[in-house]
Amino acid sequence: MTNVFGNVVNVKQYPLLDSNFRNHCKQKLDEDSVLVLDNFLTSLAIDSIKAEGKDNQHLAYFAEKNHNIYLLPPDAEFSPDHPRNREVVSSKGCITTDQIPDSSALRVLYEAPQFRDFLCAVLDIE
């Protein structure tokens, strides 16, 4: 793994190229339906990403939407107050990929072949 990638991901704790580690992660995800990788990013990367977000928040795209928690149309088979039909409002602000600086730790992570290969192995995507 490149030194730059090692500045973003805790590669000693998470050896993404190791097939045993990948298999363990896939098994954990399959069993628990979730995979938690505590301290996956270095504190330096987290601080950098947070600062970039703050510096670039003026570039964010903001959206608000009404929907149920399942993100599906209402279902007449359930009462109006059932979670399937209860409407919530969500709002979000997203900084789009083209607004992320080229030198960003986030871009390093997203564009790293070793990270994509790890995700494909764990998610069983070819």
Regions inferred by a protein language model and the residue ranges of each:
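Signature of the catalytic double-stranded beta-helix
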Residues: 41, 48-58, 74-126
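N-terminal auxiliary "cap/dimerization" subdomain that precedes the catalytic jelly-roll/cupin core
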Residues: 1-81
